[in-house]
Amino acid sequence: MIEFGKRATPQSAADAVRGDSGMASGMSAGAMATLAQSAASTHAYYDTTFSRRAMKVLPGEYSVTTEDLMLVTVLGSCVSACVRDKTLGIGGMNHFMLPSRNEGESILSPSMRYGTHAMEVLLNQLYKAGAKRERLEIKVFGGAAVLAGMSTLDVGERNGKFVLEFLRNEGLTVAAKDLFDVHPRKVYFVPSTGQIMVRKLRSQNSAAELDSEAQYASKLSKSITTKPASRLQLFT
């Protein structure tokens, strides 16, 4: 295991967009629904290994918490950004991938806009909770080459490069990263302290989680629209 380093609010990104009046995503309803499954599918549990209350963040979801809560996800080709306000100890995690499309890698392409949306939803929810841009600590994980039949598309590498490019374009510093490779990862993030533990999964125990990621990838490819999507405004 590698170590880096009130109320939890797991939500769908579609709900977050609907809550921001005057902001239109330009995505189809199907794409927005796929971006984050319903909040009910993000599971709260007690983690006996770490003796902590925890919340699972599944593919397409994000969660923001102001409590002493551990956020947990399993990543294959998807990526997660773990973001916290170092002063307030509030933070959040997302779990997403870019839809596969036969297009250029421009940051303005439809699938790249989809990734931008996933990142901006998380950041906006943190800003609304009181986080400040200048106090953000950001660590990113995932992007492994693990999805069967998709390795030739460099899905994981594409996702990892996207999140790094997004943060660079936004002028946000990456404090730590663990990207690419061929092994799935289980990420444990405690926003209140900034502690992150990453376990590389080298067995088949993560098959169920990776199956859900593959299903998520399939839905993305079918639901993403080529209609231009507006960037969300970042509130700082």
UniProtKB/Swiss-Prot annotation:
CDD domains: CheD (cd16352). Its EC number is 3.5.1.44. It is an enzyme of class 3 (hydrolase). InterPro entries: CheD-like_sf, Chemorcpt_Glu_NH3ase_CheD, Cytotoxic_necrot_fac-like_cat. It catalyses: L-glutaminyl-[protein] + H2O = L-glutamyl-[protein] + NH4(+). Residues 1-20 are annotated as: Disordered. Gene3D superfamilies: 3.30.1330.200. GO terms for biological process: chemotaxis. Transmembrane segments: none annotated. GO terms for molecular function: protein-glutamine glutaminase activity. Keywords: Chemotaxis, Hydrolase. Disulfide bonds: none annotated. NCBIfam families: PRK13487.1 (NF010013). Belongs to the CheD family. Probably deamidates glutamine residues to glutamate on methyl-accepting chemotaxis receptors (MCPs), playing an important role in chemotaxis. This is Probable chemoreceptor glutamine deamidase CheD. It comes from Ralstonia pickettii (strain 12J). The gene is cheD.
